[in-house]
């Protein structure tokens, strides 16, 4: 890591062309696959097929030597593709697959460098020493509790994937000016796409690439999402600007929709930047809130249904003319918040209406006033969690606990630790649920699955195993909410523990929730 920082300091005067030579440095590949150095990298390390730490240095030297050879990338991807579907030599397939993944990982590592340095310098300028709490997943839920109760409509958006990799490279070209590096990246993606297109359809090409090159695809996809979110922020600023004027409404130009059909990509951007305040129509009070998670997004508004339809129309046109993506109408659903429940970041969220009557007394007369209050509610999606547990082989599809045969070779303490970690993570993440009954069911499935796994290992029944060792064996990984609340709320508020199953707690230390499939 010191070598990399020294290289960056040395090339600070010529930042336009410092990325390409890094492809021929050994420490870049060591950095990409060394789990001990992943603290400075954004994403978690990706396991390489058949990767062996003992032979890594030899393979890296061999890879760098082959990079200098002519037509290396073509033969590399071609060998990997042929060996995948034809009878192949295992060693050749290992080396071709390893080299392909090493190059993909090194591309991702190198291209992250300018953005990581920019991020660190930004927080140093803003003097934000503890910015990790801002990354907490739970930090968005208090915001939604405060804002969604005052809004009317929500658009559930499924962000489309770009059709061709060239679009992703063009987006990246706006941020990185290293021409040789971009040419090599474009060539690698082009050959990968062409050789895979002979075997799979074009729609599945990006899907296969995302599975085999997770880190690089994630970076390119985030750049693509950032580009269209920049468009969204621009429109939002225009609407805020229009709100400050004295006029109550702005009418759109008559021929705007006819003009936009003939615009090319660059022309469309020019129109957006120069004439949006004259061509788009916004309501007097367009309160908008946008949240993105994974490949989906939510756009909530206090405006009318007509305003939401116009946002939907502009999204479709932007995707079509700027990214060349033909998006189907089912990708954006407009719903009224009071009648809609949506699956959001592991929770089933909805807006509940509470009707109550308030007695008002004026002098000798008294009368009742009906009031309606809105409350943002989050519950545990039991069906989705049971599906994840079933996919990870902890239970059946109907929720019946089963043993985990693949873990029977582990020690008892390792089995307890694995089940305990999953149970604590789920309990910690879903602490914001207003109803804990569903979470108790998930805990019961994990507890009984752990007991069945231990009983299978010792060739005994669950009842006999628990009777011999005691039921307290499984209680050490089962953290109750009362224990957590007792740490947060000391003896000054003893009454809160009585209704702890209804209390919602949002934590600021949750960066991500592990997929249960990873524990299989």
UniProtKB/Swiss-Prot annotation:
PANTHER family per the UniProt record, alphabetical: MATURASE K
Organism of origin is Convallaria majalis (Lily of the valley)
Question: What function does this protein fulfil?
Answer: Usually encoded in the trnK tRNA gene intron. Probably assists in splicing its own and other chloroplast group II introns.
- What is the gene name? matK
The name of this protein is: Maturase K
Q: Which GO terms describe its cellular component?
A: chloroplast
Give the GO molecular function terms.
RNA binding
Per its UniProt record, what InterPro entries does this chain match?
Domain_X, Maturase_MatK, Maturase_MatK_N
The domain of life is Eukaryota
Q: Main localisation, per the record?
A: plastid
Assigned protein family: Belongs to the intron maturase 2 family. MatK subfamily.
Keywords assigned by UniProt, alphabetized: Chloroplast, mRNA processing, Plastid, RNA-binding, tRNA processing
Q: Which GO terms describe its biological process?
A: mRNA processing; RNA splicing; tRNA processing
| Cell compartments where the protein resides | Plastid, Chloroplast
């Amino acid at each position: 890591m010191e070598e990399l920082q020294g290289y960056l300091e040395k090339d600070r005067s010529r930042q336009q062309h410092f990325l390409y030579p890094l492809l021929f440095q050994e420490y870049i590949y060591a950095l990409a696959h060394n789990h001990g150095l992943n603290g400075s990298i954004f994403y978690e390390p990706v396991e390489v097929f058949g990767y062996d730490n003992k032979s890594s240095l030899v393979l890296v030297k061999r890879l760098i030597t082959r990079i200098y050879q002519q037509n290396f990338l073509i033969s590399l991807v071609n060998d990997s593709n042929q060996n995948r579907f034809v009878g192949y030599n295992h060693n050749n397939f290992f080396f071709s697959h390893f080299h392909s993944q090493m190059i993909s990982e090194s591309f991702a590592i190198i291209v992250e460098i300018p953005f990581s340095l920019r991020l660190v310098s930004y927080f140093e300028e803003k003097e934000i020493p503890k910015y990790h709490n801002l990354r907490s997943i739970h930090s968005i839920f208090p915001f939604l509790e405060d804002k969604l109760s005052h809004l009317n409509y929500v658009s559930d958006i499924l962000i489309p994937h770009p059709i061709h990799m060239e679009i992703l490279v063009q987006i990246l070209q706006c941020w990185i000016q290293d021409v040789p590096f971009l040419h090599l990246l474009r060539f690698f993606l082009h050959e990968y796409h062409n050789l895979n297109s002979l075997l799979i359809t074009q729609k599945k090409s990006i899907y296969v690439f995302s599975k085999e090159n997770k880190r690089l695809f994630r970076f390119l996809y985030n750049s693509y999402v950032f580009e269209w979110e920049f468009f969204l922020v621009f429109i939002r600023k225009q609407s805020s600007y229009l709100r400050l004027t004295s006029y109550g409404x702005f009418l759109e130009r008559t021929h705007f929709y006819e003009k936009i059909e003939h615009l090319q990509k660059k022309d469309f951007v020019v129109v957006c930047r120069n004439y949006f305040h004259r061509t788009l129509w916004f309501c007097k009070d367009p309160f908008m809130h946008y949240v993105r998670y994974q490949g989906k997004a939510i756009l909530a508004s206090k405006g009318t249904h007509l305003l939401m339809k116009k946002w939907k129309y502009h999204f479709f046109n932007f995707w079509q003319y700027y990214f060349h993506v033909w998006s189907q109408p089912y990708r954006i659903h407009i719903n009224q918040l009071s009648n809609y429940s949506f699956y959001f970041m592991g929770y089933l969220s909805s807006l509940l209406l509470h009707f109550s009557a308030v007695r008002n007394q004026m002098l000798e007369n008294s009368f009742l006033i009906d009031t309606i209050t809105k409350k943002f509610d989050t519950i545990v999606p039991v069906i989705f969690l049971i599906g994840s547990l079933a996919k990870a082989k902890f239970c059946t599809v109907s929720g019946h606990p089963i043993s985990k045969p693949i873990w029977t070779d582990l020690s008892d303490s390792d089995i307890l630790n694995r089940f305990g970690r999953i149970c604590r993570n789920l309990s910690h993440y879903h602490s914001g649920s207003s109803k804990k009954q569903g979470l108790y069911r998930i805990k019961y499935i994990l507890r009984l699955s752990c007991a069945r796994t231990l009983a299978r290992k010792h060739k005994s029944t669950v009842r006999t195993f628990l009777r011999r060792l005691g039921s307290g064996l499984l209680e050490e990984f089962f953290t109750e909410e009362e224990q957590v609340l007792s740490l947060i709320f000391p003896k000054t508020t003893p009454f809160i523990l009585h209704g702890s199953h209804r209390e919602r707690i949002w934590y600021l230390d949750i960066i991500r929730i592990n997929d249960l499939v990873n524990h299989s």
